[in-house]
Curated annotation (Swiss-Prot):
PROSITE patterns: RIBOSOMAL_L27. Gene3D superfamilies: 2.40.50.100. PANTHER family: LARGE RIBOSOMAL SUBUNIT PROTEIN BL27M, RIBOSOMAL PROTEIN L27. This is Large ribosomal subunit protein bL27. InterPro entries: Ribosomal_bL27 (IPR001684), Ribosomal_bL27_CS (IPR018261). The keyword Ribosomal protein applies. One of its GO terms (molecular function) is structural constituent of ribosome. Disulfide bonds: none annotated. Pfam families: Ribosomal_L27 (PF01016). Keywords: Ribonucleoprotein, Ribosomal protein. GO terms for biological process: translation. It comes from Prosthecochloris aestuarii (strain DSM 271 / SK 413). Residues 1-22 are annotated as: Disordered. Belongs to the bacterial ribosomal protein bL27 family.
Length: 84
């Protein structure tokens, strides 16, 4: 017979790395071209004028300017970059 108990297993002990999602540039703030405005999962925000969208749905500025949020279609916020 074993004189030590066998090591038990656990179903816990995992934690995923943080993804740092959310709005990175507030409305009215000045951004340069290529700046990330929103990191998101899915299209909570849609790109508007002078804003682009990456393959992971990140919204970024295409030109230097000011960030502007507005209500778009289907209850989605739309993000525009207004030239300064």
């Amino acid at each position: 017979m074993a004189h030590k108990k066998g090591g038990g297993s656990t179903k816990n002990g995992r934690d995923s790395n943080p993804k740092y999602l959310g709005v990175k540039a507030a409305g009215g703030s000045t951004v340069s071209a290529g700046s990330i405005i929103v990191r998101q999962r899915g299209t909570v925000f849609k790109p508007g004028n002078n804003a682009g969208i990456g393959k992971d749905h990140t919204i970024f500025a295409l030109i230097d300017g000011k960030v502007s949020f507005r209500n778009g279609r289907n209850n989605k916020k739309q993000i525009d970059i207004l030239p300064v």
